[in-house]
Amino acid sequence: GAQVIIDQFIASGERKWSRASGLVLLLPHGYEGQGPEHSSARLERFLQLCGQENLQVLNCTTPANYFHALRRQIHRDFRKPLIIMTPKSLLRHKSCVSNLDDFSKKNSFHRILEDHALNNKNGFISLKKSGSIEKVIICSGKIYFDLLEAREKAKNDKIIIFRIEQLYPFPAKSLAKALKPYAKNARFIWCQEEPKNMGAWFSVRDYIQWTLDNIKASSNIVSYIGRDVAAS
């Protein structure tokens, strides 16, 4: 029943009837062992509905970024529906934390977040300099913490991970700025926990490809790493 409301009113109401909406949807999303009916908010369906900046689709990975997303939603001088993927496991994840200063007015919502290891205070391994990085992994959502844990366990200092916190409107220029230092030597990979026909892959692929072309990356084809196509 909700799909009809989302398709006919939330996604297209402003275009059809000039009716702006600031509705916020918090949708549980993530592979957490609860079965298919509890694992997917159908992120791919929301991204298919996106066009002409009609929606905002987020997948936040820090408390501060979630706070600033809601704060921004209230203080903007226009209204757009806000769709947020909200994995339950991040409520208790030891690395999903923010400093009190991160919630202040000095900070704001970040559409892209960098690797924890780039901040030496976090206690993670020290990464090689940008020219020696071999793989740049781009992801969104809670899989970031799985990738972070796996890299720490392997002690691989030649992999860096970036998180896309705002999937639409896609922050292509911000991503280009973040990836440019790695353009010469690194391979670029999109990683997701959803099956290939779900999640954000088919939506972000062209944006990331534009980004790699824009920064003139030596390895300018983005690779996919994740589950194969699945029916559920």
Regions found by a protein language model. Name each.
Residues N59, A64-C96:
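Structural signature of the thiamine diphosphate
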Residues G1-G22, P28-Q48, H68, R76-R79, R92-S232:
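Thiamine diphosphate
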Residues I10, E14, R71, A176-K180:
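Generic structural signal for well-ordered alpha-helical scaffold segments
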Residues G51-Q52:
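Short glycine-enriched loop/turn motifs at secondary-structure junctions
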Residues G1, Q56-T61:
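Extended catalytic/binding region for NAD+/ADP-ribose chemistry, centered on the ART fold
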